[in-house]
């Protein structure tokens, strides 16, 4: 079976500059609208949205590979790193802290990307993780690497990565491309990110975790490319929503050796960035509608604890699943009083059950109330 790294022009990727520039202009137009929308927020609100988006993207980055992590732990870890006050401090989670460290290093550390830094990211992914781990952590693989697909009892080899003897040399070329300032002038940030991510996945330098690191590399390139802008768009979140297309595109491009053209890949990634910008604006709009609705609630129908908690839920100062225990702790009231408050808000349609049972039972703010009532709450 042929692979892209067998092409005689590897790794000289090519793409249609006209098409790429056209869709990139669309992205810049949308980004301008997004930046304008977020510019009206105060510093704390901007930081809160930034934390929420980062947490969403970190969880999505793992979920793309069917890896799971506790969202509340990630949100708590990011909040602490960015000095965002939390209504309830969640206990530290070593795995969430490691994933957070990698993600923040990718977007905030604009120093050149090195082999040592990538190996450090690899250690962060696996050292505190439960379950199966690759034999080698924090260094390149030393054996053949296959990408497999299971169909019932059948196992199909979808892709064979670059031979391990060539990995170190291939990675030096990739890192040189990423760190070369001339390439930043030659390619727009999304095109450059697309090239680097696909190139890395094609090499597949590690025994596991390559997809997660490829998306961290994407974040690094985008953050460096847009260093003067607010980072509110999250590529991994959009990839997760379109995961089948993502894997199909990678497979189509890497499992052949006739062409080095990656125009479709760059177009797709740019479209994901556009959708991510739109999603950020939509999330902001819903939150503002929700906050507006809360400000117009009749205080005579709710006690002070209920009003206080509703505002914390609406403006994001409390995030995650609300439990009876958390309510009692935050409001310094008895469990019985907390339960009565919560049940009252459920009856009013403001809280909805999480669907969990036993100790995991909890509640969330009803996401529909802002849409339903926000426009009439002015």
Name what the model sees in each region.
Residues 1-378:
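FIC/Doc superfamily catalytic core
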């Amino acid at each position: 079976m042929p692979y892209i790294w067998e092409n005689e022009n590897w790794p000289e990727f090519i793409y249609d500059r006209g098409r790429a520039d056209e869709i990139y202009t669309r992205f810049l137009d949308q980004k301008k609208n997004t930046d304008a929308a977020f510019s009206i927020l105060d510093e704390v609100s901007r930081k809160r949205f930034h934390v929420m988006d980062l947490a969403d993207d970190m969880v999505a980055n793992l979920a793309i590979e069917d890896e799971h992590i506790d969202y509340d732990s990630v949100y708590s870890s990011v909040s602490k790193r960015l000095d965002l006050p939390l209504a309830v401090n969640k206990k530290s989670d070593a795995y969430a802290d490691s994933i957070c460290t990698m993600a923040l290093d990718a977007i905030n550390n604009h120093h050149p990307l090195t082999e040592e830094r990538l190996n450090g990211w690899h250690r962060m992914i696996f050292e505190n993780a439960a379950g199966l781990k690759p034999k080698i952590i924090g260094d390149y693989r030393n054996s053949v690497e296959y990408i497999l697909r299971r169909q019932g009892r059948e196992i199909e080899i979808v892709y064979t990565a670059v031979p391990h003897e060539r990995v170190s040399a291939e990675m030096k070329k990739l890192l040189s491309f990423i760190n070369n300032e001339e390439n930043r002038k030659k390619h727009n940030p999304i095109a450059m990110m697309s090239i680097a991510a696909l190139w890395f996945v094609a090499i597949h330098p590690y025994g596991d975790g390559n997809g997660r690191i490829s998306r961290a590399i994407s974040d690094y390139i985008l953050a460096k490319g847009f260093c003067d802008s607010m980072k509110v768009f999250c590529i991994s979140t959009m990839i997760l929503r379109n995961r089948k297309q993502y894997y199909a595109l990678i497979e189509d491009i890497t499992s052949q050796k006739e062409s080095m053209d990656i125009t479709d890949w760059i177009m797709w990634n740019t479209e994901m960035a556009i959708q991510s910008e739109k999603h950020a604006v939509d999330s902001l709009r819903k939150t503002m509608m929700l906050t507006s609705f809360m400000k117009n609630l009749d205080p005579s129908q709710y006690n002070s604890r209920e009003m206080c908690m509703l505002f914390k839920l609406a403006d994001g100062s409390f995030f995650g699943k609300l439990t009876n225990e958390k309510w009692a702790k935050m409001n310094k009231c008895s469990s019985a009083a907390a339960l009565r408050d919560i049940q009252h808000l459920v009856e009013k349609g403001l809280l909805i059950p999480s669907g969990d049972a036993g100790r995991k039972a909890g509640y969330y703010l009803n996401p529909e109330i802002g849409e339903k009532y926000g426009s009439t709450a002015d």
